[in-house]
């Protein structure tokens, strides 16, 4: 076991705060509409330019191990806020730095750190309740557009794209961000249910120009097993052939004699058919087959519930308005399933999302909800260079998360105004003793920090603006982009309540832990002896 370096009291805290300040100073220059860029060197490729606080925070690692501990703790603030709300990482870092720097003055003056932390916690609870009470619902797409624009550093085109995407696929729909191939941003929307499985054989394609199989008003057969024997399918095929409608078969696999017979019948025009592998694996495949069944009004033919393929009838098949199958994807548009059954299935999956502890599982369940409830929208980012593309993608990701948070918990006045207004909720609030009251006052001063930083980044005088905003009422605040005062909601400067709340809660939590730290321990690096010179190889004499 290697030897440890141990620091106590003020010497430990001063090192930790030095690390916090290095990271926070690097992150906070990105805050606000006139936030600056941070250029990050890469060991390979071009440098990365970003205005995203969490990206900057993740890049910072300090040589001094005690300082690095402080930096990593405050980095946790931005990461946690990013995980919960998807945005507000810079605000959280600025708040953590302000609470810590205010708090350390009181600790140095001899106050009890535990009581200070209790006071900070009391104040945070009061401010969070205040934010929740003043939040306005973000129902209309105008509000969504404004939130998206603000979060993307006042880029209105990004806000419009996100609002359009949400309008198309609904607030529950899946919206993904990808790097595009052109200069302009674009929005692609896939309506209906799409899954990443294409036709089993290219001979099923009936549109040779696009190499897709398009089926109008088809029957849909869902089978939870491999099909290799054509005899199992004959009764269903004959029944469908009599109707003259096409047939889509979704099964674990279709192979051998069964596949060959389907291909031949399709090519001869006896029956228009296409076979596709079921999406997912194991239990997830069973669940997704059930989703498709509910969406299309079909019954999954499964031996687990005592159903055999030979006994399947037209009543067991689902239908849809149109199905398009390409080499890699299948899209089912306008399934004929019962609307009430679909809504019930969506509720069921949402309940599973609430219970799930795995981020991956939650993401997959959310995708299933979107496929049942709406569709999938893809925002394709356009840019002139790869560096610009990556920077823009960071901003669009932030904006997308912010709009989701706004839909969830509503919006408050942006630009740090909601926090400054929350000071009024702390008027007359006292703790159980003087030290706790001092903790409440620490937060009272610290929550001005985001507005101060936004103003400083815009090149204006923070104290003048803070006083002007404090003298105003309601949503009155300062628009750093234009240098004007006015109603923040009317000017379209909104922040999601969830982002503001999460930033404050996580900042206060980590800052409180740092204030109550009395000892820090780290490894002493071992001085490894230099490797000895390599001796010459024997037996090599006489070579020219």
UniProtKB/Swiss-Prot annotation:
A Pfam family it matches: Cpn60_TCP1
Record-listed ATP binding positions: 30-33, 51, 87-91, 415, 479-481, 495
Major localisation: cytoplasm
The protein's Enzyme Commission number: 5.6.1.7
Assigned keywords, A-Z: ATP-binding, Chaperone, Cytoplasm, Isomerase, Nucleotide-binding, Stress response
Keyword match ATP-binding: yes
Enzyme class: isomerase
PROSITE patterns registered for this protein in UniProt: CHAPERONINS_CPN60 (PS00296)
CDD domains (alphabetical): GroEL (cd03344)
Subcellular location: Cytoplasm
Swiss-Prot/TrEMBL catalytic activity: ATP + H2O + a folded polypeptide = ADP + phosphate + an unfolded polypeptide
GO CC annotations on file: cytoplasm
An example Gene Ontology biological process: protein refolding
Oligomer status and interactors: Forms a cylinder of 14 subunits composed of two heptameric rings stacked back-to-back. Interacts with the co-chaperonin GroES.
NCBIfam families hit by this protein: GroEL (TIGR02348), PRK00013.1 (NF000592), PRK12849.1 (NF009487), PRK12850.1 (NF009488), PRK12851.1 (NF009489)
Function (record text): Together with its co-chaperonin GroES, plays an essential role in assisting protein folding. The GroEL-GroES system forms a nano-cage that allows encapsulation of the non-native substrate proteins and provides a physical environment optimized to promote and accelerate protein folding.
Similarity annotation: Belongs to the chaperonin (HSP60) family.
Record protein name field: Chaperonin GroEL
């Amino acid at each position: 076991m290697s030897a440890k370096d141990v620091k106590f009291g003020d010497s430990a805290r001063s090192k930790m705060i030095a690390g916090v300040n290095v990271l926070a100073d690097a992150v906070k220059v990105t805050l606000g509409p006139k936030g600056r860029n941070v250029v990050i060197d890469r060991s390979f490729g071009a440098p990365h330019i970003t205005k995203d606080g969490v990206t900057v925070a993740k890049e910072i690692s300090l040589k001094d191990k005690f300082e690095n501990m402080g930096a990593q703790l405050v980095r946790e603030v931005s990461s946690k806020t990013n995980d919960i709300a998807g945005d507000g990482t810079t605000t959280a870092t600025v708040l953590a730095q302000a609470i810590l720097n205010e708090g350390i003055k009181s600790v140095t003056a001899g106050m009890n750190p535990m009581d200070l932390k209790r006071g900070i916690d009391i104040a945070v609870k009061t401010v969070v309740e205040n934010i929740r009470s003043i939040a306005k619902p973000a129902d209309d797409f105008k509000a969504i557009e404004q939130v998206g624009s603000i979060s993307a550093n006042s880029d209105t085109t990004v806000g419009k794209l996100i609002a359009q995407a949400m309008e198309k696929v609904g607030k529950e729909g899946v919206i993904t961000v990808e790097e595009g191939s052109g200069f302009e941003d674009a929005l692609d929307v896939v309506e209906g249910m799409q899954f990443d499985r294409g036709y089993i054989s290219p001979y099923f394609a009936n549109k040779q120009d696009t190499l897709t199989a398009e089926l109008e008003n088809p029957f849909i057969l869902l089978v939870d097993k491999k099909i290799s024997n054509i005899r199992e399918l004959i009764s269903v095929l004959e029944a469908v052939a009599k109707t003259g409608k096409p047939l889509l078969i979704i099964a674990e696999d279709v192979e051998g004699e069964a596949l060959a017979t389907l291909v031949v019948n399709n090519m001869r025009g006896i029956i228009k058919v296409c076979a596709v592998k079921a999406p997912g694996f194991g239990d997830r495949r069973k669940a997704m087959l059930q989703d498709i069944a509910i969406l299309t009004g079909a019954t999954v033919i499964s031996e687990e519930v005592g159903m055999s393929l030979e006994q399947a009838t037209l009543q067991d098949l689902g239908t849809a308005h149109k199905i398009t199958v390409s080499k890699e994807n299948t899209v089912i548009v306008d399934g004929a399933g019962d609307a009430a059954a679909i809504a019930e299935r969506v509720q069921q999956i949402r309940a599973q999302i609430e219970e799930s502890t795995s981020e991956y599982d939650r993401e997959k369940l959310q995708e299933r909800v979107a496929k049942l409830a709406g569709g999938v929208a893809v925002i394709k980012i356009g840019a002139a260079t790869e560096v610009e593309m990556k920077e823009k993608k960071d901003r669009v990701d932030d904006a997308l998360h912010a709009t989701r948070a706004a839909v969830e918990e509503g919006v408050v006045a942006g630009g740090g105004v909601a926090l400054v207004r929350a000071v009024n909720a702390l008027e007359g609030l006292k703790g159980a003793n003087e030290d706790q009251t001092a903790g409440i006052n620490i937060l009272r001063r610290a929550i001005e920090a985001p507005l101060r930083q936004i103003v400083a980044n815009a090149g204006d005088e923070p104290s003048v603006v803070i006083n002007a905003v404090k003298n105003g009422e309601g949503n009155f605040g300062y628009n750093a982009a234009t240098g004007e005062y006015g109603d923040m909601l009317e000017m379209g400067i909104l922040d999601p309540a969830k982002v503001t709340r999460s930033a404050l809660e996580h900042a206060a939590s980590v800052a409180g832990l740092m204030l109550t730290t009395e000892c820090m321990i780290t490894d002493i690096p071992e001085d490894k002896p230099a490797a000895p010179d390599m001796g010459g190889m024997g037996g090599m004499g006489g070579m020219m």
